[in-house]
From Swiss-Prot:
This is Fluoride-specific ion channel FluC 2. The gene is fluC2. It is a multi-pass membrane protein. Its main location: membrane. GO terms for molecular function: fluoride channel activity; metal ion binding. The keyword DNA damage does not apply. The chain crosses the membrane at residues 1-21, 34-54, 66-86, 103-123. InterPro entries: FluC. Keywords: Cell inner membrane, Cell membrane, Ion channel, Ion transport, Membrane, Metal-binding, Sodium, Transmembrane, Transmembrane helix, Transport. It catalyses: fluoride(in) = fluoride(out). It is found in: Cell inner membrane.
Length: 124
């Protein structure tokens, strides 16, 4: 039961931070797809950094709970995969297949690069 609590608290924090970032960046009149890309890139980087740093805490008694809190709860909630999929679907419905493919390739590529960069920074 306590594992669910760690995931839930992390998810609450991640969702609220995502909301705040989206709200603040939305005031800049950026494209919705670009906002989602920024948030997902940040979450991917943070997850990579966290997972590289968590290795240093393996001996720590609560390392498993930290993993639940951050990797599943916080970063899982911070990223906006469902919004990303919705944008792809919406572009396909509008027959904007090239834009959908471009969004897919850019988002996945940047997400992987951001994750790897976070992982790399954490091991330095």
């Amino acid at each position: 039961m306590s594992d669910i609590l760690f995931v839930s608290i992390g998810a609450i924090l991640g969702a609220n931070i995502r909301f705040q970032i989206h709200h603040k960046l939305g005031n800049l009149n950026l494209d919705k797809g670009f906002l989602i890309l920024i948030i997902n890139t940040f979450a991917s980087f943070g997850l990579g950094l966290f997972l590289s740093l968590v290795e240093q805490f393996r001996a720590f008694t609560y390392s498993y709970q930290l993993i639940l809190f951050f990797s599943i709860g916080f970063f899982g909630s911070l990223s906006t995969f469902s919004s990303f999929v919705y944008d792809l679907f919406d572009l396909c419905l509008q027959l904007e297949l090239f834009r959908a493919l471009k969004l897919f390739i850019i988002s996945v590529s940047i997400g992987i690069i951001a994750f790897a960069f976070g992982l790399f920074l954490g091991t330095q």
